[in-house]
């Protein structure tokens, strides 16, 4: 397969450059907010539209700061500790989903504590929204030619311009499909068909469980970060960080369905 060589920069005006990566965050947040509002309109849970509007600022800060610090601390600390100014260059890419998720969770906790809202009631509404951002983010990774997969002889193999010119799995597209489209469909089905918002923590549990499963599986096709490589001989950082999410998700599902 031929890699569609798309310029990562949409346009630039002097020193200001707008990239597909940055745009994916903006569109993801806007679409997510719109979808969350539709969920609130449909089910009228404890969370109101005003709550969602107030939460946006918390969410944006938590996701961006958490995602960036997660990447800096977990994936490439030596580079950023020697060049701290590079931490601010988010337009170059380099965001950790696990860091962003943790940042978002902390932001949600602080928001709920301030406004006296049930924490899981908020995360249950946010859970069906997150795959939208995951899908757009992975498409942006693909456009950037980063986070590509391992070498393959299959027909899916694609030569990325920033690699060693060997055909590799387009693992960004695998993640966009499973962590984005499939996970979005699962949560939309459970939310609207099975009314899972009625069981506190269930939507959150479904998200964490399926994301963990999908990420652990797709990491088999994804090239480990060169500065880290494999951990414990065969595991990647992404797989290790996804195990707690899988366990947390399973726990929340069980807790939402007490016998």
UniProtKB/Swiss-Prot annotation:
Annotated binding of a 1,2-diacyl-sn-glycero-3-phospho-(1'-sn-glycerol), by residue: 138
EC class of the enzyme, as a word: transferase
Membrane-spanning parts: 9-29, 55-75, 92-112, 117-137, 172-192, 201-221, 228-248
GO BP terms: lipoprotein biosynthetic process
InterPro entries xrefs: Lgt
Pfam families in alphabetical order: LGT (PF01790)
Pathway: Protein modification; lipoprotein biosynthesis (diacylglyceryl transfer)
Enzyme Commission code: 2.5.1.145
Disulfide bonds: none
Source organism superkingdom: Bacteria
Membrane topology: Multi-pass membrane protein
GO CC field: plasma membrane
Keyword Transmembrane helix: yes
Entry keywords, A to Z: Cell inner membrane, Cell membrane, Membrane, Transferase, Transmembrane, Transmembrane helix
One term of GO molecular function: phosphatidylglycerol-prolipoprotein diacylglyceryl transferase activity
Family as reported in the entry's similarity comment: Belongs to the Lgt family.
Function statement: Catalyzes the transfer of the diacylglyceryl group from phosphatidylglycerol to the sulfhydryl group of the N-terminal cysteine of a prolipoprotein, the first step in the formation of mature lipoproteins.
The protein, known as: Phosphatidylglycerol--prolipoprotein diacylglyceryl transferase
Source organism per UniProt: Rickettsia conorii (strain ATCC VR-613 / Malish 7)
Lineage: Bacteria, Pseudomonadati, Pseudomonadota, Alphaproteobacteria, Rickettsiales
């Amino acid at each position: 397969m031929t890699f569609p060589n798309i310029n990562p920069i949409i346009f630039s005006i002097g020193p200001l450059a707008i990239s597909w990566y940055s745009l994916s965050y903006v569109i993801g947040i806007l679409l997510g907010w719109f979808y969350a509002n539709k969920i609130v309109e449909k089910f009228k849970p404890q969370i109101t539209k005003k709550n969602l509007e107030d939460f946006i600022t918390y969410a944006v800060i938590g996701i961006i700061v958490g995602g960036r610090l997660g990447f800096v601390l977990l994936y490439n600390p030596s580079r950023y500790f020697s060049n701290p100014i590079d931490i601010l260059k988010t337009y170059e890419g380099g965001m950790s989903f696990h860091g962003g998720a943790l940042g978002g969770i902390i932001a949600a906790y602080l928001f709920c504590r301030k406004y006296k809202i049930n924490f899981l009631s908020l995360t249950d509404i946010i859970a069906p929204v997150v795959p939208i951002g995951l899908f757009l983010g992975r498409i942006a990774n693909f456009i950037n030619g980063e986070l590509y997969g391992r070498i393959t002889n299959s027909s899916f193999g694609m030569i990325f311009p920033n690699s060693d010119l060997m055909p590799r799995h387009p693992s960004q597209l695998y993640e966009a499909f499973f962590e984005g489209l499939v996970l979005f469909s699962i949560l939309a089905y459970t939310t609207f068909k099975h009314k899972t918002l009625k069981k506190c923590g269930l939507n959150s549990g479904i998200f964490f469980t399926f994301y963990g499963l999908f990420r652990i599986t797709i990491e088999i096709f994804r090239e480990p970060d060169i500065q880290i490589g494999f951990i414990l001989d065969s595991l990647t950082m992404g797989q290790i960080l996804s195990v707690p999410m899988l366990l947390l998700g399973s726990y929340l599902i069980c807790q939402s369905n007490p016998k």
